[in-house]
Amino acid sequence: MPRITTKVITLLGWFSMAFLMLNLMSCKSSPKQSPLPPEARVLAFGDSLTFGTGAMPEESYPARLQAEIQHEVVNGGLPGETSSEGLKRLAIWLDEYEPRYLVLCHGANDFLRSLSEEKAAENVRAMVKMARDRGVDVMLIAVPKFGLKRPPPDFYEQIAEEFDIPVDKHILDDVIRNSALMSDLVHPNARGYGLMATAIAKRMQKSGALAP
């Protein structure tokens, strides 16, 4: 039987290390959440993208998400709201509806008005912390900078990593780049909102919040 050379052993060691690192990265990118009980309520919170501007109320992503996951989904979208305003409003909605799960999609109006990205990041982080401090599980929807064909800022992923929560970095960016899924330059149409709802439901399943 031929002897295994030091070079081969070294290569095997590198391959093993690479495999381990990939597994660790995979685990890090897939946060785990507690399964939602049947009576659990979901709060979708944000601005006009959550409200459903550009489509009928029953075609908004919260309405479509409710049909997909068989949980009550409260639409907490307020058109025109900045992240600073959302931070002030969130506590009221958490107190009133007592959700077990929060889908947070905020920052669009900060970007449209060229407000501070650092302040938007601070506000989104504060909203996530507020929910987590109350025992509410959270998922982030990353918002791209409209009209610039640029991906969402890195702070969404950084906040998700800090709090070990899921984040969808692609769905809204993908919808906005496809004119067939848009009602105007900023808001999706019914098809676009439907795709958002499906992506969110799948992400909730992947995290363990929903049964597959």
Model-found features: residue ranges?
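Serine-esterase "nucleophile elbow" of acetyl-processing enzymes
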Residues: 28-82, 89-98
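Alpha-helical cap/lid subdomain in secreted, periplasmic
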Residues: 68, 88-212
